[in-house]
Amino acid sequence: MIPELGQVFLVAALASALLQFLGGIGSFSRKIENMEAFIERITVFQTFSLLICFGLLTTAFLQNDFSVLYVASNSNTALPFAYKVAAVWGGHEGSLLLWVLILSIWTFLLSKDRALKSSPDLRIQSLSILGLISFGFLLFILYTSNPFERLLPSPFQGRGLNPLLQDPALVIHPPTLYAGYVGLAVPFSLAVSSLLTVNNHQWAMHARSWTILSWVFLTGGIALGSWWAYYELGWGG
């Protein structure tokens, strides 16, 4: 049941990302107040859908549901609790799901930025561009990297998590690094939006705080990754 529900919410997130993008296009021909409210609701729904997806995948790991191919490939019954949670993003499919979830959270936070509400055109176009980025990632996940793919008949035991990844750093490093990488999509969307709107001189002012916050996450993630590689892979000699 978990894989099927995950598929439903992935498709729902894909549809909402597309509507978020199309809403920005529609703002050129409709009342901007109506489109603002519409896009904001769609952003909330997309974030909610992806949180449900992530929660379902985490539940599959904690329940040792080896009928899910991704779980069987990255976990087993002997894996400690913390590593079962971290294994959710320990492989390709799960890390992409984490990536797009963080992107949706950044998008949601941007939609609640009070300072940006003084520039409705810039706000709508930025959210629209972020919707297009989310749509691309979700389409890629659904067609090439689906974490909810079934494995039937299901094995009694999974293959387990890569021993190199069984480290406390796995719990912190990928989310921190991804928050930095993905967060830079916000200033990117503001910069592109400035090319599509009339009052484009304000984008740098709005982007500054988002850029600094993303830079802090990215710096922390790279520093932690360097430390992890130093002792885990023996790069320090």
State each model region's role.
Residues 1-237:
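Polytopic transmembrane helical bundles with strong interfacial aromatic enrichment
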